[in-house]
Regions:
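Active-site groove signature of glycoside hydrolases
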Residues: 111-129
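Beta/alpha (TIM)-barrel catalytic core signal, keyed to glycine-rich beta->alpha loops juxtaposed to Asp/Glu
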Residues: 127-211, 221
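Active-site mouth loops of central-metabolism enzymes
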Residues: 20-32, 89-104, 125, 130
């Protein structure tokens, strides 16, 4: 597996986005299948593992933490806060909350579920526009100083927002959808990443498989290298 530089880390060029193990597009795999997928990814040389508090309303991080705890030193573990499931009388709903106290709570919950003392790369999942980006990133900077996270990333932000955030604390990565169909990062974000030394971490390079002719569910057919 080829590698790339991601902030202070050397990671596999292809990472495993874990969202679909418990959340979002189509029927998620069983926990047993999810475990097999995670272990197969490690076998194939994947070292970049990406999850979030939102995915499965915590179930995704719990699965990743349980399965990958024995391999913690072999991976760069990424998660996200600022968007999570919140309990309401009519069920759990997605809430964007970038207040410092919410981010601290999200991080502590993620550390517990992931069974780790520190998250390598912690993204602000979405910018809460009711909260200045400087306040949200300032809270994440405090988590770096406290040893809870090692580095900070942003997800789905504009170039202008990236520059504002980077002025508070170095941003090592911007996660954004990028594919043949979705080219939004080319509108200034790629240039901003280059100028600031931040990596662009592209998700859904196959546009969530919505334009593919078939889906692949047999992990025994996954290629051994990339």
């Amino acid at each position: 597996m080829k590698t790339r530089r991601l902030g202070p880390f050397e990671v596999s060029a292809i990472g495993l986005g874990c969202m679909n193990l418990s959340h979002a597009y189509g029927e998620p795999p069983s926990p047993e299948q999810g475990e097999r997928i995670l272990l197969k990814a490690l076998e194939l040389g994947v070292t970049l593992i990406d999850t979030a508090a939102l995915y499965g309303f915590g179930a995704n991080e719990t699965l990743v933490g349980r399965v990958l705890k024995p391999y913690r030193s072999q991976i760069v573990l990424c998660s996200k806060g600022g968007m999570a499931g919140v309990e309401f009388p009519d069920g759990v709903k997605r809430v964007i909350d970038g207040r410092p106290e919410a981010l601290r709570r999200n991080c502590e919950d993620s550390l517990r579920r992931l069974q780790t003392e520190c998250i390598d790369l912690y993204y602000l999942h979405r910018w809460d526009k009711k909260v200045p980006i400087e306040d949200s990133v300032g809270a994440l900077s405090e988590l770096v100083r406290a040893g809870k996270i090692r580095s900070i990333g942003l997800s789905e932000v504009s170039a202008a927002t990236l520059h504002r955030a980077h002025a508070v604390h170095p941003i090592v990565a911007v996660q954004s959808e990028y594919s043949l169909w979705t080219r939004n990062p080319e509108i200034a974000v790629l240039d901003a990443c280059r100028s600031l030394g931040a990596a662009l971490v592209a998700f859904s390079p196959d546009r969530k498989s919505t334009r593919l002719n078939s889906s692949h569910t047999d992990i025994s057919r996954m290629p051994s290298s990339a």
